[in-house]
Amino acid sequence: MENINEYKICKADPEEWARYHAIYRLTKFNEWMSLSFKSDIDRYAKTNFCYWVILDNKRVGGAFIKPNIFKCIFTIPPFHNHNELIKVLTLYVATISDKCNSIVVPDADINDIDYYKNSGFCLERIDKLMICPTNESDITLKERYKFMFPRREHAEEMAHLYFETYSNNNLQYIATQSYEFQVSSVQVFFDHIKSMNVTNEWSTLVYDKVTKKFIGACTVSLVNDLPYVLDFVVHPDFQRKGLASMMMQRTLKLFFNSYPAIRLNVTEGNDAEAFYDKLGFISLSRKGYMSKLI
């Protein structure tokens, strides 16, 4: 085993780093099922957080590093010591981080979980990126409901819907999210579609004419060249009535002539897993969300 002090962390040229990342990580850890090799490179080509790990004046790995977070790690053959690479990165990130907050790794390769644990990390959850081909299907909505497009004036009602729905989730980290967190999530949606020049007509709100409330939402933006579902909720009082299927079928049909597939993220153990499987979604990758107190 090498002496940890013999390693160095050096800033990388983002475009060059992105080429290595695409080859040494994405070819074996399919996080996004990118539409092209170029898009894998372009995703990081203008960022400012790409780093090399150096040993004996040779690049042996790379990572995307910010205070309190590192991700996208990869090794460069013939170096394959993931345990040491993770240890080196953990020690370095601790020196640039806020000691009041944890260090997180949001995309840990499942095969490396034990190595992260060796460096003091805990596995909080496993997330799965899922994908489904767009398709055409007939949609019949009951008379008491109607589809609407989300607008900023709906933000407060959407936040209430999110809060009331996610509070009933079977996963604690979701169920304990605050109302303020959901307000922020709604804001992120509107900001993201604006920055990506995405129409709000990609997204769906379901309005109940009887209660005069929004009871469902499927918000969609563009991530890595494909539509990506940011939030998908149906109010607990209206679940198991076919509304979720109708919203997702509308979304899959909407993109049938313009995009080959849509993607979303789900946490393993979430009740929604079975629903997405029923609609034809398949997992692209499983990645661990790790955290460590400094």
Describe the residue ranges of each PLM region.
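Acyl-donor-binding surface of acyltransferase catalytic domains
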Residues: 1-2, 79-145, 149-151, 288-292
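A short beta-loop-alpha structural element at the N-terminal edge
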Residues: 2-20, 146-173
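Conserved donor-binding loop and adjoining core beta-sheet/short helix segment
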Residues: 12, 34-96, 216-230, 236
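A conserved beta-strand-loop-helix scaffold within acyl/acetyltransferase catalytic domains
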Residues: 34-43, 65-69, 172-227, 232
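Conserved acyl-CoA
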Residues: 84-100, 246-261, 277, 282
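Conserved hydrophobic beta-strand within the GNAT/NAT acetyltransferase core sheet
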Residues: 102-106, 229, 262-266
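Short glycine/proline-centered loop/turn elements that form peptide/ligand docking sites
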Residues: 244, 248, 269-272, 291-294
